[in-house]
Amino acid sequence: MKALDEPPYLTVGTDVSAKYRGAFCEAKIKTAKRLVKVKVTFRHDSSTVEVQDDHIKGPLKVGAIVEVKNLDGAYQEAVINKLTDASWYTVVFDDGDEKTLRRSSLCLKGERHFAESETLDQLPLTNPEHFGTPVIGKKTNRGRRSNHIPEEESSSSSSDDDEDDRKQTDELLGKVVCVDYISLDKKKALWFPALVVCPDCSDEIAVKKDNILVRSFKDGKFTSVPRKDVHEITSDTAPKPDAVLKQAFDQALEFHKSRTIPANWKTELKEDSSSSEAEEEEEEEDDEKEKEDNSSEEEEEIEPFPEERENFLQQLYKFMEDRGTPINKRPVLGYRNLNLFKLFRLVHKLGGFDNIESGAVWKQVYQDLGIPVLNSAAGYNVKCAYKKYLYGFEEYCRSANIDFQMALPEKVLNKPCKDCENKEIKVKEESDAEIKEVNVEDSKNMIPKEETPAEDESERKENIKPSLGSKKGLLECIPAQSDQEKEANITKLEEKESLEDKDGATARAEEALSTEVDAEEEQARSGYDEWIKADKIVRPADKNVPKIKHRKKIKNKLDKEKDRDEKYSPKNCKLRRLSKSPFQSNPSPEMVSKLDLADAKNSDTGHIKSIEITSILNGLQASESSAEDSEQEEERCAQDPESSSKDESKVEHSAHSRSELISKEELSSPSLLEENKVHPDLVIAKTVSKSPERLRKDVEAISEDTDFEEEDEITKKRKDVKKDTTDKALKPQTKTWGKDRYCIQTNCLQSGSPGKKEDRTKSKEPLCTGNSSNSSSDEDEEEKSKAKMTPTKKYNGLEEKRKSLRTTSFYSGFSEVAEKRIKLLNNSDERLQNNRAKDRKDVWSSIQGQWPKKTLKELFSDSDTEAAASPPHAAPDEGTVEESLQTVAEEESCSPNMELEKPLPTSVDSKPVEEKPLEVSDRKTEFPSSGSNSVLNTPPTTPESPSSVTVTETSQQQSSVTVSVPLPPNQEEVRSIKSETDSTIEVDSVVGELQDLQSEGNSSPAGFNASVSSSSSNQPEPEHPEKACTGQKRVKDTQGVGSSSKKQKRSHKATVVNNKKKGKGTNSSDSEDLSAGESVTKTQAIKSVPTGMKTHNSKSPARIQSPGKCGKNGDKDPDLKEPSNRLPKVYKWSFQMSDLENMTSAERISILQEKLQEIRKHYLSLKSEVASIDRRRKRLKKKERESAATSSSSSSPSSSSITAAVMLTLAEPSMSSASQNGMSVECR
């Protein structure tokens, strides 16, 4: 506060520097109102009082011995501890201003400017080595304890005496002593045993000169006692204790001998301290186990010496309580419970608090505590925490030579060792944990019971447990075999199991495969799971922020899963490649026979398998699907015995033809084209290599089975369509939708009626032909993205993709909802489709068994995803989607069970869908509602070109026949994302919109016509300019909605959301064009259908969305979105899993990060694009509304506008996929 030579108070006339407006100016004291407070300690009893200076005789100087006037008026000797000048001074400045100030605002003239020791000689220029040193001396400590400095200095002016005292005190430190004191009545001399401790133990107790700090064995309290009153105790010289002191004295002797801590120096840790500490440690363990951070270390550190920790805390808490600073709340640091024991050991290892000078060391201590460093103050915070809680205890332990002898001797002495041990243990534990994880994953591979992906694990556990037996058998067989063999064997085993167990075995086999792949995935994932962060995942700016956030979460999960899938998809790719050669080369006779057998048996279990696959695709677990299968079968039988029998006959018929086709295909496997020819159903899925004619032939061959029961099938097909819609929605593969729809429509048309088939076929041929190349390129791209995005597991990778997506499954909750809805839809669809699905699935499964997944992916990429459920159905799904919407609306109101019964829209659906599309197309003709016509009008282009986006719909529909394959990756992504997230988010919006569509379909075929028109893009219907306009609108909507392939999910959701928000009319410009009445009808229908639709929605959120939006515009939109999804595959951020396979984990990470950076950059550019796109979309919508009446005859302008809109959409998707750079440029 003041320099030592400053007077205790200032006198009038003193020249000072006084603070005036923040600056010190020369002034002179004019008047002084003196008030000097003096803190003194009486020498006779060491009591401290504060008095005014007028009660003191003697020099007012710290450390001076003076006489102080007592309350009774007597003077007693005392030592001045502290002087405080509380006087008020009125000063006059040179200009005459007066101001009244406290002493703190004054300083003696010049003192502030030239400290005593500073002279001009030491200025930097003349004293270079002092360069940089401030001329003014360092400020004295201005803290609360600043007064101790002068006090100590002055009192230690007689340094010799003080040094002697200190030496004596140091000698006494840690000694057991007896402290003499006089009772309050001064009649009796008393004593108590105590332990001399370091004065630094307590800031609260001021230890005066000649005093020492002791801790009493009697009550554990800390007191400052005069040095002269302390006598060392030895067993010989100890005074005789009385009864009161007996226990304390014994404890003191015990401590003297063996350093045994007295019981009253410990505290029973209170519930909130000890148990809370234990709990907190458990919490820490939980938190840190999750992170596998230091908590495991802490626990490991603590567990070897639990009693030590307890002993330490008992003593610490008691120590803090006795010195007057109890720890009432659990110490917290960095939002974590602070492990004081660990902190104490860490600091001890570093030599104690006083030896740690660097903040970096403290920061390391902070990190060693396992607390995440949240800011730059971490080191300071831990230092303060240590000083607050442990520094006094450290000094106490040091001075008392307390090594926590109960168990802490090791702890304190061996703290470093313990730390090292603990650290080693931690490292070992962490490595062990990793090894264990790997082993567990391996064991999971071996024992499908354990689902490798953590996400899958929970879902799979349900399925796995029942399937353990069969899986174990499978797995036991598998380990010795090569991966190819494993896959082949697993497929065979799965087929056999499905034959044997129908319901459960297939699921088990699939799970076994999935577990293997998952295990590999997990291992692969383990390296990269965490590096993809939400902030790194680029998403288009969306108006629906909350949903976007939700999607972001889901998307992040999906992306992670994608990475995982990619990580293990390399394996899948490898497996596919490995199996590819055998597959392409003629499959082994065993495989063929097995496949044929499986097909034959699968004809029975085909629907089950399809259900399983569908359920898997939809996110249903195999076990659930198997259970559902039986239920669905029962329901089917109960609900539709006739149709089911018909279906069965159909299924049997198709199954036989399929098995024949399969065998043929196996023989002809070398060429995909041959395969396509041989296997119409598969061809539909594989359509990549098929020519339109072949597709037609295949479709016709397939439809021939259904022709005889066209009417029943139409009904069933509608149901199937519902299911397909659901499945499609689940398989939101955008491209596949369009293509599938096209295929479905053509197939449906063909199967619907020969004449219609022929017509459709004719229209189909040009489209297919035009699009086959597109679809092929799309397929290639999609295959790449598929490899990327979805690990294809046994069943076309669909099951696994879905599983992985499911696993990724944004949330098991979503998957469950989706599963439930899927179950309902699947059951109804499965009934009709079971037969065909059986046939196709049998064929499919046999094909899967024979062909490498990669080949299947290439052939069926789109179909694969969809074909995985049912190769042919993939196409029908789209057409079916719309119709199934109708049917769903109808059937949902009629019988959700029917939907439930409908297994997969798989191959069965394609036929019904084909028929339905005919109907739908007819309705479409009635309704100009869908922009698909304009899309149809637009010349087919490769889906990748912007116009091809428009056409992509067409080509998608066509190439969905030809190339349903490419879509799967994105679709699956979208599907899984949507099926689960969307199922939740979109379920509402989609439900509404599907219901709208359904209600439209029910109330007016217009809604379906719109969807159908988009779905049956085969029929270029320039008839309705409105359709063209709506197509454009849809394209725009699609742009807005499905603006991103990655974000397709998001875009779909956005579309649904937008539809909801816009009133279903806004997004679906067609809806607007159609009429408010239709919207009303939709709303009503929605109300009636909501449950069923929700099921559909959850099942196929993406698809439903597209129906919702695309029901009128939606279908087109989905197609466009799907193309958008396809397109992303080509972009610079797309890559092949096979490439990733060959990389090291570090390379993979760096590459993925590079891709993310590119995507981010693209995203930022797209972000601005989106705004302009939105504006354009609004303008286009306006124009479309205006020109809807005028341009009804001109479909080409609308198609061109649609193309533009598609380009915009692509640009928007490029936002999401960032893969549409060219598209976005075009849009710009």
Curated annotation (Swiss-Prot):
Cystines in this chain: none
Residue spans of biased composition, Low complexity class: 944-965, 1003-1017, 1188-1204
Residue ranges annotated for the ARID domain, each copy included: 306-398
InterPro entries for the chain: ARID/SWI1_ChromRemod, ARID4A/B_PWWP, ARID4B_ARID/BRIGHT, ARID_dom, ARID_dom_sf, Tudor, Tudor_ARID4B_rpt1, Tudor_ARID4B_rpt2
Alphabetical list of Pfam families matching this protein: ARID, RBB1NT
GO terms of molecular function: DNA binding; transcription cis-regulatory region binding
Cellular component, GO, one term: nucleus
Glycyl lysine isopeptide (Lys-Gly) (interchain with G-Cter in SUMO2) cross-link, renumbered residues: K428, K461, K664
Ranges annotated as biased composition (Basic and acidic residues): 437-464, 483-511, 556-569, 596-606, 635-667, 691-700, 721-730, 755-765, 825-843, 911-926, 972-981, 1112-1124
Coiled-coil residue spans: 1141-1186
Biased composition (Polar residues): 744-753, 927-937
PROSITE patterns: ARID
Biased composition (Basic residues): 546-555, 1046-1064
One GO process term, biological-process aspect: establishment of Sertoli cell barrier
Positions carrying Phosphoserine: 276, 295-296, 482, 579, 581, 588, 630, 691, 703, 930, 945, 1068-1069, 1071, 1075
Subcellular location: Nucleus
Residue positions where Phosphothreonine is found in the record: T706, T942, T1066
Domain remarks: The C-terminus mediates interaction with mSin3A corepressor complex.
Function: Acts as a transcriptional repressor. May function in the assembly and/or enzymatic activity of the Sin3A corepressor complex or in mediating interactions between the complex and other regulatory complexes. Plays a role in the regulation of epigenetic modifications at the PWS/AS imprinting center near the SNRPN promoter, where it might function as part of a complex with RB1 and ARID4A. Involved in spermatogenesis, together with ARID4A, where it functions as a transcriptional coactivator for AR (androgen receptor) and enhances expression of genes required for sperm maturation.
Quaternary structure, from the entry: Component of a Sin3A corepressor complex consisting of SIN3A, SAP130, SUDS3/SAP45, SAP180, HDAC1 and HDAC2. Interacts with ARID4A. Interacts with AR.
Name used for this protein in its record: AT-rich interactive domain-containing protein 4B
Organism: Rattus norvegicus
Encoding gene (name): Arid4b
